[in-house]
A protein has these predicted regions:
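Generic N-terminal initiation segments characterized by hydrophobic and/or small/turn-forming residues
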Residues: 14, 37, 56-59, 65, ...
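Amphipathic alpha-helical interaction modules
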Residues: 19-68
């Protein structure tokens, strides 16, 4: 997995978090969750330094869907997005931005 691919996915996540939210803020957050997951799914986590490891732990916690039920098949990320507090949303946005910058600096 390349730094470039991860940087691209996190740039996409950051972009969908920006206004406007044509399908609603919750859907934008759920889409950003998905982009982050794609960016990290095959990335070797041993490559993270101390700072980025902290951001990854925060991201993992914010995106955690264990214990969430989805009886209407809306999608676990959408349900999780609805559960985020304003502080969680701010933290998520900040972490996505920091990681996108971190990946971008290393892609070359």
């Amino acid at each position: 997995m390349s730094f470039g691919y991860a940087a691209e996915k996190f740039a996409s996540a950051r972009s969908v978090l920006m206004l406007p939210h044509p399908q609603g803020e919750d859907q934008s957050i759920a889409t950003a969750f998905s982009e982050c997951r794609k960016g990290l799914e095959r990335f070797d986590r041993t490559l993270f330094d101390d700072s980025s490891s902290i951001w990854i732990k925060q991201l993992d916690q914010l995106m955690k869907t264990e214990g969430i039920e989805d009886p209407d098949r809306e999608g676990l990320f959408l349900i999780k997005a609805r559960q985020l507090s304003i502080d969680d949303q701010l933290q998520f946005s900040t972490v996505v931005d920091e990681l996108q910058c971190w990946f971008s600096r290393r892609k070359d």
